[in-house]
């Protein structure tokens, strides 16, 4: 079996990235090595590596409520690129819980990278 182990994301300023992701993920880093410029967080079963030399990647984080998360981040001065919206309705369980809407929003992290926030909600009527 193959599983996703780690995602690397570019960070010019590791201290700034550390503060941003500590607040966003609600946890302290799992590891910090400078030099050479590596900052690790645990995100479920996947390591998030913030590294000076990494290319920019796009990550998606599952949150309980994308609308509430966006409002909290906006209050902290985070740039919201795209407001929460329904991206997909799941009829079966291939990509998400059946009978749910997948809502996404996009923001810029402290290093200018695009980050997606995702939550699932029961399909709304109408």
Protein language model features and the residues they cover:
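N-terminal beta-strand motif that seeds the catalytic metal site of vicinal oxygen chelate
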Residues: 1-15, 57-59, 118-126
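Short glycine-enriched loop/turn motifs at secondary-structure junctions
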Residues: 1-3, 51-56, 98-99
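Short beta-strand micro-motifs in enzyme catalytic cores
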Residues: 37-39, 57, 101-105
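Conserved catalytic-core motifs of GNAT/GCN5-like acyltransferases
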Residues: 28-33, 83-85, 119
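Core segments of cupin and vicinal oxygen chelate
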Residues: 2, 8-48, 68
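Vicinal oxygen chelate
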Residues: 14, 61-114, 121-123
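Active-site beta-strand termini and strand-to-loop segments that position acidic
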Residues: 40-44, 52, 107-110, 120
């Amino acid at each position: 079996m193959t599983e996703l182990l780690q995602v690397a994301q570019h960070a010019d300023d590791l201290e700034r990235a550390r503060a941003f992701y500590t607040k966003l993920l609600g946890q302290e880093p799992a590891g910090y090595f400078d030099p050479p410029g590596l900052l690790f967080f645990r995100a479920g079963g996947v390591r998030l590596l913030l590294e000076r030399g990494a290319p920019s990647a796009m990550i998606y984080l599952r949150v309980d409520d994308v609308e509430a998360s966006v409002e909290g981040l906006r209050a902290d001065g985070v740039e919201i690129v795209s407001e929460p919206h329904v991206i997909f309705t799941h009829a079966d369980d291939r990509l998400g819980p059946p009978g749910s809407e997948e809502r996404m929003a996009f923001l810029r992290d402290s290093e200018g990278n695009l980050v997606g926030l995702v939550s699932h909600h029961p399909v709304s009527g109408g």
